[in-house]
Structure formats: C-alpha cells, structure tokens
C-alpha cells in the first residue's frame, strides 16, 4: 500500500474513533462508527487474496448489520424521548437495541462468529488492528451509556463470551484464531464489569491492548502463524519465543503476570456488588482459556517438532528488526502485578 493512501486511511480510522469517543450526540457517534468501518476495510484487504477479500466482506456485513441495529435503537430513542443525546437514556427498548448493536461490533457472544474467521483471513498486522484499535470505539460508547444498560443482558453476553472464548480456542493450531478467541473471552470480562464499574473496564481494555499488541508484534518479528511455525522459531529466536510464551500465559491470566490484574479486580468488584455466582462461573470458565495457552506453551517449549535443522541455534542471523515500543510493552504485559495496590483507587 502506497504511503499517501496509508496515511489517509490511518488518519480516517483514528479520526472515526476519536469522533465516537468525544461525541455525546448519537448521530455523530454513528457517523464515527461508519468512518472507522469503511476505513479499516482496505487495511483488511491489503494482501488482495481471495481469503482476505472474504474476511473483509464478512467484517463489512457484520459491522453494517450492527450499525443498522444501532441506528434503529437511536431512532427509537429519538421517537420516544425526543432527544439525540447519549446521556440520560431512559428508554429500555432503545437501550437494549443499542447494547445488542455494540456487542455485535465487539464480537461478543452470540454475535462472535465473524471474529475468528476475519482474523484468520487477514495478515498479522491487520489482525492486530482488528483486535486492538477496533475495540476502543464500541467500549467507549458502552462506558458512556453504562448507567442505562440492562445488567442482565450484558451479564448473559459476558458469561457466554467467556465460555465461547475458552471453548473455541481449545482445538486451534492457528495463532490468529487463538488470539481471536482470546479477544472474545477478554471482551466478556470487560462486559461483565461495565454496568458496575466502567473505569475498571477501561483499565482492562488498556491491559488487553498492551498484551495483544506485544504478542502480535512478536509473531510478526518471528513470522509465526501456527503452533508448528512457533515451535520452529526456537531455532532462530529463542529469546523472542520465550517472551511469546510469557505473554501467552499473561493473556491467560496466570499470576504473577500482569494479565492476572484485571481478572482479580473484576472478580473483587463483582463480589463487592453481592454477585457471587457470576464471578465464580467466570473464574472457572477462564481456566479453559488458560488451559489452551498452557498447552500451547507446552507444545512449543517442551515438545519440539521434528526439524531438518539439527542445531539449536543458527550460525547466521538476520539483521535485527527495530521495534521501539516492544520492550516497554512487554514489561507492562508481564511485570505490573506489584502495582495493583495503586490501581485499587478504581474500586
């Protein structure tokens, strides 16, 4: 993709997200979503293969459907209340429509089917944008309308998403699909706490974005897309592969890594709100995600696949690729647990 075109597309994606985040008017919010969606499609199609075209089409259909439901909810709210503002949304029918539309945009269960297929069909860099930046706008709207959201509706979607995210990743060998199912599960954790403590949802989103960005950057660094290629990366990048496995366990929420922080704080927040069964179910279902991450770690680190290269290290190395943001991102993704008491202000 030529640099001028890339600059225009990237600026449109960023502008669309900023419009959604800063707007308190439903029409401007909807326009921001449309800017974001239409600008990200060329990013998904940049490889110009049948698979990427199919993935971009699936993404467009899912997002366009969600946008139509969102507009239906906005118009219903306008007819019943006579206002375009996002704050003080008192009508429950319109609020439910908007919540369903936003869950579809996020890929929460039961509207999660497009997420693994689209992520698998695009390149690693496009998948990184899809699973990180594209989550910011819908979650910012959920944050703004959280007082008017039906807690039961979001709780059902959250528990179903954590279950689907853990169950769906069990049989996967494609790393992009594993991260897609991980995204579904993480979105479920964020949705679960949205109606009780939206600021905690924002913290979870920040931690998730940093961990996922680090993982995708390391996959791009080592050119790994499957479990097999990741195990072969030991020959060329033993340190990078070790970092990938640590990030995987952090994404799974294994203490004492940083991924444990949001799960810990969300369970604590739900318990403070006299929710006992829900956090118990969430913690049990999170073991499914942790299991496939641990299995991936075991398959990669302890059971090396047969390879024609008999040496542990290659004598000739490629030139080092410069990734300036990678080091601080990895530190944040793995070593933030001691700072948890400082974050308790969110509770």
Curated annotation (Swiss-Prot):
Keyword terms of this UniProt record: Electron transport, Membrane, Mitochondrion, Mitochondrion inner membrane, NAD, Respiratory chain, Translocase, Transmembrane, Transmembrane helix, Transport, Ubiquinone
Catalytically driven reaction(s): a ubiquinone + NADH + 5 H(+)(in) = a ubiquinol + NAD(+) + 4 H(+)(out)
Chain segments annotated as coiled-coil in the UniProt record: none
Principal location class: mitochondrion
Cellular component per GO, a single term: mitochondrial inner membrane
Location(s) in or outside the cell: Mitochondrion inner membrane
Pfam families documented for this protein: NADH_dehy_S2_C, Proton_antipo_M
Record-level Gene Ontology MF annotations: NADH dehydrogenase (ubiquinone) activity
Quaternary organization: Core subunit of respiratory chain NADH dehydrogenase (Complex I) which is composed of 45 different subunits. Interacts with TMEM242.
Protein name, as recorded: NADH-ubiquinone oxidoreductase chain 2
Organism annotation: Potos flavus (Kinkajou)
Organism classification: Eukaryota, Metazoa, Chordata, Craniata, Vertebrata
Gene this chain is encoded by: MT-ND2
């Amino acid at each position: 993709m030529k640099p001028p075109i890339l600059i225009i597309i990237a600026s449109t994606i960023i502008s669309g997200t900023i419009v959604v985040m800063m707007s308190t008017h439903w029409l401007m919010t909807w326009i921001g979503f449309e800017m974001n969606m239409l600008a990200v499609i060329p990013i998904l199609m940049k490889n110009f293969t049948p698979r990427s075209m199919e993935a971009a089409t699936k993404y467009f259909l899912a997002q366009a459907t969600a946008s139509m439901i969102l507009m239906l909810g906005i118009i219903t709210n306008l007819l019943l209340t006579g206002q375009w503002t996002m704050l003080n949304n008192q009508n429950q029918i319109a609020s439910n429509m908007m919540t369903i539309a936003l869950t579809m945009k996020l890929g929460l269960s039961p509207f999660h089917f497009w997420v693994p297929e689209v992520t698998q069909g695009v390149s690693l860099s496009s998948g990184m944008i899809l699973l990180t930046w594209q989550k910011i706008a819908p979650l910012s709207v959920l944050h703004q309308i959280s007082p008017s959201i039906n807690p039961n509706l979001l709780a059902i979607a959250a528990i179903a998403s954590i279950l689907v995210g853990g169950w769906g990743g069990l049989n996967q060998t494609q790393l992009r699909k594993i991260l897609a199912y991980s995204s579904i599960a993480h979105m479920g954790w964020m949705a679960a706490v949205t109606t009780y403590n939206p600021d905690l949802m924002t913290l979870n989103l920040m931690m998730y974005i940093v961990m996922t960005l680090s993982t995708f950057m390391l996959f791009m660094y080592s050119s790994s897309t499957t479990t097999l290629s990741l195990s072969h990366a030991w020959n060329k990048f033993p340190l990078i592969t070790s970092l990938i496995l640590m990030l995987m366990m952090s994404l799974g929420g294994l203490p004492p890594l940083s991924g444990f922080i949001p799960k810990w704080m969300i369970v604590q927040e739900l318990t403070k709100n006299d929710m006992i069964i829900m956090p118990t179910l969430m913690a049990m279902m999170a073991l499914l995600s942790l299991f496939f991450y641990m299995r991936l770690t075991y398959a990669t680190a302890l059971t090396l696949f047969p390879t024609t290269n008999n040496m542990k290290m290659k004598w000739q190395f490629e030139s080092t690729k410069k990734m300036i943001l990678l080091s601080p991102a990895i530190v944040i993704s793995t070593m933030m647990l001691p700072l948890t008491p400082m974050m308790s202000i969110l509770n």
